[in-house]
């Protein structure tokens, strides 16, 4: 439903240059989701993603089932790395906004961002992320 609203708003108000939306690996089909990001890309609009950690729910108190799924990856990542890299892996995201709570947290975000780039996930990593998202839902 939210995708319809996004399209309607962008059609009615064509002066937008950038759009902010919530997105994480468990939000692919929530609100405008990945379909919304792709639509923005097709319109040559910038996209800002906020809250990729879902208020830290994706990095704190991780269930053992999720940890076991992450362990199937050839590259070992922290939950923070999985969440941020999922966003940076996309070619339709221009900026990421997240709550930074400490200097140490900022340093960790910078370190992850410095190793992140578009299309860096392997097919196996994409399958793992899909499985993790399903497990959360």
Question: What are the residue ranges of the model-derived segments?
Answer:
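Beta/alpha (TIM)-barrel catalytic core signal, keyed to glycine-rich beta->alpha loops juxtaposed to Asp/Glu
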Residues: 1-137
């Amino acid at each position: 439903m939210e995708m319809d609203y996004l399209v309607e708003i962008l059609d009615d108000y064509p002066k937008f240059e950038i759009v902010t939306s919530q997105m994480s690996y468990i939000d692919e089909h929530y609100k405008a989701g990945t379909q919304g990001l792709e639509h923005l890309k097709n319109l040559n609009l910038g996209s800002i993603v906020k809250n990729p950690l879902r208020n830290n729910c994706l990095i704190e108190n991780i269930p053992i089932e999720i940890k076991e799924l992450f362990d199937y990856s050839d590259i070992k990542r922290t939950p923070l790395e999985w969440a941020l890299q999922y966003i940076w892996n996309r070619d339709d995201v221009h900026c990421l906004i997240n709550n930074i709570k400490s200097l140490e947290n900022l340093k960790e975000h910078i370190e992850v961002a410095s190793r992140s780039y578009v299309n860096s996930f392997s097919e196996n990593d994409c399958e793992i992320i899909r499985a993790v998202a399903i497990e959360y839902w």
